């Protein structure tokens, strides 16, 4: 009989505005896991952005206190949600991160404009650039706090996984825009093994 208790788990979909996090969330979010999302709260309760963000934050804190599984999306351009993940780690949570970025914030600006044209929510251009820069700087801390971390470059039509952390082993895969040195600078990891992370034929 197995008496090992499963750790509570957080799945976080992170990355700058316009990188394509929501698409990853739709595909990879476990249907049985509660999803805490400010945009959905805003839509369901018809409240403003600030109230939705505050409600989402309170909900995450409640789940954390109760040691319940949950997943959420975040730009992770400030330390607020990073601090939440650190506290979760200290409480014994298993943290799985899917980090989605692009090679150039201009791509993010274009995608947000396309999203707005289709009826989606807007983010001011200057905020996209500022958050992109702040988010990229925090990537090493995201990698450090995660038990499993996948980083995808989503600049092209097909996402390309450039990095994977699992059980304190680190793997990378190169493409035109991302070579080992650049991936090392992004993640803060120098001791990485090259591996086909994209199942190319």
Locations of regions flagged by a protein language model:
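Residue-level recognition of beta-strand->loop/alpha-helix junctions
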Residues: 37, 74, 99-101
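Conserved lysine of the Walker
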Residues: 21
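Phosphate-binding P-loop
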Residues: 1-7, 63-64
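Conserved substrate/cofactor phosphate-moiety recognition/catalytic segment
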Residues: 24-70
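The conserved Walker
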Residues: 16-17
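NTP-dependent small-molecule kinase module
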Residues: 141-201
């Amino acid at each position: 009989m197995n008496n090992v208790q499963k750790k509570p788990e957080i799945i976080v979909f992170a990355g700058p505005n316009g990188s394509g996090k929501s698409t990853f969330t739709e595909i990879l979010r476990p249907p049985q896991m509660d999803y805490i999302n400010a945009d959905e709260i805003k839509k369901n309760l018809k409240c403003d952005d600030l109230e939705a963000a505050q409600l989402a934050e309170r909900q995450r804190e409640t789940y954390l206190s109760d040691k319940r599984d949950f997943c959420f999306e975040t730009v992770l351009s400030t330390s607020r949600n990073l601090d939440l993940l650190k506290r979760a780690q200290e409480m014994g949570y298993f943290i799985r991160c899917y980090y989605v970025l692009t090679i150039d914030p201009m791509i993010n600006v274009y995608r947000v404009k396309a999203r707005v044209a289709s009826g989606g929510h807007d983010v001011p251009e200057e905020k996209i650039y500022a958050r992109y820069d702040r988010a990229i700087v925090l990537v090493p801390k995201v990698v450090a706090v995660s038990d499993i971390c996948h980083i995808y470059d989503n600049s092209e039509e097909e996402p390309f996984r450039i990095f994977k952390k699992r059980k304190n082993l680190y793997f990378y895969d190169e493409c035109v825009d991302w070579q080992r040195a650049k991936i090392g600078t992004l993640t803060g990891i120098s001791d990485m093994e090259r591996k086909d992370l994209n199942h190319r034929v």
